[in-house]
Structure formats: C-alpha cells, structure tokens
C-alpha cells in the first residue's frame, strides 16, 4: 500500500433474513426512469410513526455514493463512486431527514455518472438495505428499505455524454508523503488494523462458531474460510506501508469529507482517504465493544477495496444492530460486519521481542518495523 497526501488540503433483503415486528417502520423506495440513465427515487415512510434517519449514503446525499445497484445480464455493473464510513453520534442536522407517516421525498440522480453504461442495452436497477435512525443525533437503530426492480433500455451515446462524478487524480502533481502527527496516527492505525485483522482471521477460521454465527449468520466452512481469507488479505495490505495494492491518502483528495464522514474508499481506483475527524474524533483503539476507532475504520475501508480482496464489500448496514440483522449473503459482503467482528476479537499480546523493538522505534514515518 502506498501512503500519500495532497499537498493542499440483492434483492433478497427480507427473505429469510429478518424477523421484524409487523409494526416496524419501513421505507418503500419507488424507482422510475426520468430520461435514459436519469432515475428518480421516491422514498415513503410506510410506518405509523415519524422517523428521523441518516440520509448520507442514501437518497438525498449529494456525494457520488451507491444509491442503487445496476445489473446487466444478472452481473452487477461496477460502481465508480465512493463508499464512506460515517459517525454514529454527534451527527450534524444537515445529515438527517425526518419523515412523518405516509410522507415522501424525491431524489433524482444519473446512474451513468457512477457506472460505465456506454455499452448501452438493458440494465436492471434495484436497491435494498438499512438506513440508520437517530435519537438526539446519535444512531439508535435502523430502518429497512427496499425498492421495486426497474428495467431500462440505455442509449449508449447519451450515457457516454454523462460526465463522470469522479475524475482520476493527476498523480504527477500535488502529491507528497504523509508527515507529522497524521503520519504517526495512520502508521499506528495500520499496525493496529493488521493485528486486529490477523486475530479476526484466526477467530473466523477456528474460533467460536457461536460468535461467528452472531455476526455472519452461518457457520458453514466455506463462509468461515472466505471471511478468514479477507481478513488475512487486509492484514497483509495494512502491514505493507510502502507498497501494496491500494493508495492511502492522509487527507481528502476529492473533497468528499464533511463533518460526518470519517473516511471513504474509491473502489474503482483502490484509493482510501481519511477525513479530518478520523484524527480529531476517533481514538487509536477503542476499549468499548462495537465502538468506532481509527484501526477498525481503516480495516472497514480496506474491505471495500477489490484489489485487497475481491469482490470488495458494500455498505448494507452500519452498526451492530443493523449489521447483525442482515442475511448471511449480505453479512459476507458488508464492510461494517468485518469491522465489528474484528473489534470484538482482541489480538494476542505481542511477544517481548516485538515490544522491545516498538520501544526503540522513534520513526514517525513509514519505514518497516524491524
């Protein structure tokens, strides 16, 4: 993994997955075609109670996030936008939407801005997942959502004319090495992420089956092997601070950080970026179960990158309650499920020799440990 910094600043969600009470609020999403690849989503609160939820990583988010999944001949079209990890408390008011019972809101977006649809032809669009609900600007639960399946015929020429939401960076300019306190913090986070991922890999492959079932909703050997393999791949990537398969920015190269975003990944470029609150808000390692910290945030972002382990994960759910309500197939591809499992898997104590070298290490840069 190369560490750099800018010099200037699915459809089966419900089937067999959930045992929700009949009166549980839900969001119904109706997708319609506006013009070619431009889509309108109408989101309705079908419950009997007012709900306040986080609309970031959802409809009404102005950033190029994954609002829907696109399929051509049953194969998902690669998403070229960003996937980001959000705060779970202290959220700003502009990150929240409140819907009364029966109320709706609409969001229009162009799917060709975050996917290559220049081939044209038939594309199927759908979405499902969970949206975090909040109390006093803190995530307190989740609300499920699901859409209709929309089939559109894409005009290839029109799709090609849609500007891409994210332009590739010119890596020849405005790029320098991490330095100072952020370099030190990220170096520590990478070491901790590698340690947590290694411990989680062992727990996934040969640890408690009850605990694995809690997070991944199955104890099948194939799933345990897949989860362990992804954790080992994350540990390997986090252990290499001067080379690797991803590029890690200490700050935001694209301008998609805000007061609610800890970090984000651009899977199509295997690029990860930390936001300001990654450093100011998160501890290096939390002592609380299922809480956020720098190490598990970095681990979460690594799971999104397909070059680390393919396919990269999605964000079907955030937090323990929502993540443990997923189906087995969704949990296997949910980034926060990996972060939560790793958070609850304490790494083995380091050997005395390792501690000795750490005490002697005064380098704040990115040279390898002895």
Curated annotation (Swiss-Prot):
Residues 1-19 form the signal peptide. InterPro entries: Fungal_M35_metalloproteases (IPR050414), Lys_MEP (IPR029463), MetalloPept_cat_dom_sf (IPR024079), Peptidase_M35 (IPR001384). It is found in: Secreted. The active site is at residue 301. Disulfide bonds join 178-250, 257-275. Keywords: Cleavage on pair of basic residues, Disulfide bond, Hydrolase, Metal-binding, Metalloprotease, Protease, Secreted, Signal, Virulence, Zinc, Zymogen. Zn(2+) binds at residues 300, 304, 315. GO terms for molecular function: metal ion binding; metalloendopeptidase activity. Secreted metalloproteinase that allows assimilation of proteinaceous substrates. Shows high activities on basic nuclear substrates such as histone and protamine. May be involved in virulence. PANTHER family: NEUTRAL PROTEASE 2-RELATED, PTHR37016. This is Neutral protease 2 homolog AFUA_4G13750. It comes from Aspergillus fumigatus (strain ATCC MYA-4609 / CBS 101355 / FGSC A1100 / Af293) (Neosartorya fumigata).
